A protein has these predicted regions:
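Residue position within the beta-strands of beta-propeller blades
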Residues: 1, 5, 34-39, 86-91, ...
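Structural motif
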Residues: 1-4, 43-54, 96-106, 147-153
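C-type cytochrome heme c attachment motif
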Residues: 2-4, 33-36, 52-54, 89, ...
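Multi-bladed beta-propeller domains
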Residues: 7-21, 57-75, 106-123, 158-173, ...
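Beta-rich catalytic cores
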Residues: 22-24, 49, 73-75, 99, ...
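Residue-level signature of beta-propeller blades and closely related beta-rich strand-turn architectures
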Residues: 40-41, 92-94, 143, 208, ...
């Protein structure tokens, strides 16, 4: 499954996500960005066997991690943007019916560094949290056992304690509660996407910049080029016992002495990056998949840099040159 936008009447559908694996239902932030759960990488490979919460503009641009989930329960989902400065979600381990698990949240102020366990499900499982206009929280809850079902409960907004029962129906699961109330209108967003184009641009200020353990060697250089790896979608001819995602090399581009690179690639194609040394050996690789939309210019500060840092006020050497074209590009630079 993928994310699509459309006109209000359902016409003119347009795809805006290109993960090689399925993504889950989104919610909308007040600034108009969409939040959704997706695999961090290829399930079962390269540390990709867990989902993260991702953010994206409603035109498919600027895909970024909202909650990376490097070490939490593997299957966060059921994302709900609260009215209280929190984003709620379910943390599942794959054992509870219908993907139930604990309730957790991150704050809108620091989503990358604020993951908090809200309500543990040691004696059952939660699903579908809902932040209410009156400051309360609802969630579906199912006690442990084979003959139980999900019912709707009010949850204490501070302690996560399960309070009074709101609704139940014997033999049925009560899920996906919605509040019939006035909701703040989200902001509109301008778009750089030009559907007459077929490429976009990735640029990096310095691949020497990183905050990840094990990548300290990048700070002193060592990466001579960047390789773009493309995910190839399944077809009717794909073998059932093959890898979950086929990969092929789209191409390589040089990294300048200051660590910068500037590359034009086909749009709407899932890609990941690998940094190579002068002999062609891999010195670092990206786990997650990303893409650019037509005529999008997507920049990053470094290689797994601190996402809260300010971009250095420098002009990368690669930015003074035309982007290196990889794949069958038609050329977007103007």
């Amino acid at each position: 499954t993928a994310l699509y936008t459309s006109d209000l009447d359902g016409g003119n559908p347009r795809r805006i996500s290109y993960h090689p694996s399925s993504v889950l239902a989104p919610d909308v932030l007040a600034n108009g960005r969409l939040l959704f759960a997706a695999w961090r990488g290829t399930p079962g490979e390269n540390g990709g066997s867990r989902r993260a919460l991702m953010g994206i503009n409603n035109d498919g641009t600027d895909l970024m991690a909202f909650h990376d989930n490097h070490d939490g329960p593997p299957y966060p989902h059921s994302v709900r943007v609260g009215r209280d400065g929190r984003v709620y979600f379910v943390e599942a381990d794959g054992t509870a019916p219908l993907g139930g698990g604990d309730l957790a949240y991150v704050t809108l102020r620091r989503p990358l560094h604020s993951r908090t366990l809200f309500a543990a499900s040691s004696d059952g499982a939660f699903l579908d949290p809902l932040s209410l206009a009156d400051g309360g929280v609802l969630a579906s809850y199912r006690p442990a056992g084979d003959d139980t079902s999900y019912s709707l409960y009010r949850i204490h907004p501070s302690t996560g304690q399960r309070l009074d029962l709101v609704h139940e129906k014997a033999g049925f699961d009560v899920l996906d509660a919605q509040e019939l109330a006035t909701h703040p209108r989200v902001q509109g967003r301008s778009s750089v996407v030009d559907l007459s184009k077929n490429t976009g641009v990735f640029f990096c200020v310095s691949s020497h910049t990183t905050d990840r353990p094990g990548l300290e060697h990048l700070k002193s250089g060592g990466a001579a080029s960047v390789r773009f790896v493309e995910a190839v979608p399944f077809t009717k001819k794909s073998t059932a016992d093959g890898p979950r995602v086929e990969e092929k090399t789209l191409g390589q581009a040089p990294i300048e002495n200051d660590g910068s690179f500037h590359v034009e690639v086909p749009s709407g194609v899932p890609l990941r990056f690998e940094l190579l040394d002068e002999e062609g050996g891999t010195v670092a690789k990206q786990v997650s998949w990303t893409w650019v939309m037509p005529r999008e210019w997507r920049g990053c500060i470094g290689c797994h840099e601190d996402r809260e840092m300010v971009v250095p006020n420098i002009m990368g050497d690669a930015f003074t040159k035309r982007a290196v074209q990889l794949g069958q590009t038609g050329g977007n630079e103007e």
